[in-house]
A protein has these predicted regions:
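N-terminal low-complexity, Ser/Thr- and acidic-residue-enriched intrinsically disordered segments
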Residues: 1-109, 115-119
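Gly/Ala-rich beta-loop-alpha elbow adjacent to hydrolase catalytic centers
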Residues: 206-210, 214
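Short, polar loop/linker segments at the starts of domains and inter-domain junctions
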Residues: 32, 129, 294-296
Length: 444
């Protein structure tokens, strides 16, 4: 069998893109889980049928997919969390398996991938309880995902943010539904029970929020000795904020070296394991190191509009306040910056650079955080843009395959942009109101 056109790094990133499709819909938890499972059936083999959409047996990946992505089987999930009955997916994860992955500079190995979903722009829970919950920290040395609370920073032990601790707890608490792959099991139970063939790898991957959760989950399960059935555990996080502080980053780096023993170093910037890859024009991975947060307001140039510039400076200032409040010094795990390029349009709409409005800023942010990693197809007079990891997005499913589970509604890109703007303004306003209340108390 010929190797797919995507290398191993790109295939793994492709899995992170697939699980992220959960953000494109609204519905109940059950409806969203079925929709994600249906979407996966175009790309993966052995996805259990979604009978409500007329499927009658396990899937076979579409013929347009395997020459690009390779032949992967769904073996667990997908599982999905909807925390507040808010009609959106807050966390999602699945596990896929391939009999033979050719690792550049390394061997050909059977491989499992744990793919974790990115931040859902429409999820207030994601923003408040996971992404932005960094002013308090949790001691990693005593962390128990089923029961934890923030603690004072002692400067000696490794610590993770409260948001990261919450996300890991959520992922480990998920149980697959009866119509999913490996029904009625948790992720930890599944990984502990797998009996892989000799010389099998497992890779944890995820983008954005999952760029913080995937290395943290891999480290937790490794320390709990849940990965012993596998000969090699790797991580491929992208666009993630910092999950923890200096001691945590050092612990991760020493546990997961960037180059497995005996493997050859690769030449392209995205080609390294156990390394967080990030676009240097992406706002999200500038969190939560203070020196990087100090760049976000003017990352796309200082706005000529007073109110826009004031809003972005407030966003930056409040982010720094939150990141430094606990006393922990947030620090990236080993990482590789990728060189982004500013974009001047989104579809047929122009984007002002520097941004004249919050809309300009968020549209640029969205492109840099999402589309620049996976490539942008040509659109009218706009030429295609080669992605930083994928040259172009994975093959799209044809309209004949795009069925929708009853009760599900789709979320447009414009709606995502509007929601991000709303979340940012709401977050700034919440901090400003807190400052006003503190000022009133001090006057009294």
């Amino acid at each position: 069998m010929n190797n797919p056109s995507l290398d191993a790094y790109q295939q793994i990133f492709g899995m992170a893109c697939l699980v992220g499709r959960s953000s494109g819909y609204k519905g109940t938890a059950s409806e969203l889980q079925q929709q994600l499972q249906y979407d996966l059936s175009f790309y993966l083999n052995n996805v259990p049928p979604v009978t409500i959409l007329g499927q009658t047996g396990p899937s076979t990946a579409d013929a347009s997919v395997t020459p690009v992505l390779g032949s992967w089987n769904l073996v667990w999930g997908p599982a999905l969390l909807q925390e507040n009955n808010d009609d959106v997916s807050d966390n999602a994860v699945f596990v896929a398996q391939c009999d033979a992955v050719a690792f550049p500079g390394g061997p050909v190995m059977p491989t499992y991938v744990v793919a974790i979903a990115a931040t859902n722009p429409d999820s207030l829970y994601d923003w408040e309880s996971e992404d932005f919950s960094v002013s308090q920290v949790v001691n990693w040395s005593t962390y128990n995902p089923s029961s934890f609370s923030p603690s004072d920073y002692n400067g000696t032990d490794p610590y993770i943010s409260l948001g990261t601790a919450t996300g890991i707890s959520n992922l480990l608490g998920l149980t697959t539904v009866e119509t999913a792959a490996a029904p009625g099991t948790t992720l930890e139970q599944f990984l502990s029970s797998v009996q892989p063939t000799e010389n099998t790898a497992v890779i944890f991957c995820g983008h954005s929020l999952a760029g913080a959760l995937s290395p943290t989950l891999a480290l937790y399960l490794t320390e709990q000795k849940k990965m012993e059935a596998f000969d090699l555990t790797l991580v491929y996080p992208t666009a993630g904020a910092t999950p923890g502080e200096t001691n945590f980053a050092s612990l991760f780096n020493s546990t997961f070296p960037a180059l497995p023993s005996g493997w050859e170093q690769q030449s392209l910037p995205y080609q390294s394991w156990n390394t967080m890859h990030w676009n240097d024009l992406d706002v999200v991975p500038h969190a939560w190191q203070k020196q990087d947060l100090q760049q976000i307001a003017n990352l796309y140039g200082p706005s000529p509009n007073f109110w826009t510039e004031a809003s972005l400076q407030a966003l930056q200032a409040y982010a720094i306040v939150d990141s430094t409040q606990s006393g922990a010094v947030y620090t990236r795990i080993q990482n590789s910056p990728l060189s982004g390029t500013l974009q001047y349009s989104m579809g047929t709409s122009a984007i002002n650079v520097p941004p004249k409005s919050i809309q300009d800023f968020v549209e640029q942010l969205f492109i840099q955080h999402v589309e620049m990693y996976s490539g942008i197809p040509a659109d009218g007079s706009n030429p295609e843009v080669t992605g930083l990891i994928l040259p172009q997005p994975l093959p799209p499913s044809p309209s004949s395959y795009n069925k929708i589970v009853p009760g599900i509604s789709t979320v447009t890109e414009a709606e995502m942009i509007a929601k991000i703007i709303s979340q940012i303004i709401g977050w700034i306003s919440k901090h400003a109101l807190s400052d006003m209340k503190s000022g009133v108390k001090e006057e009294k």
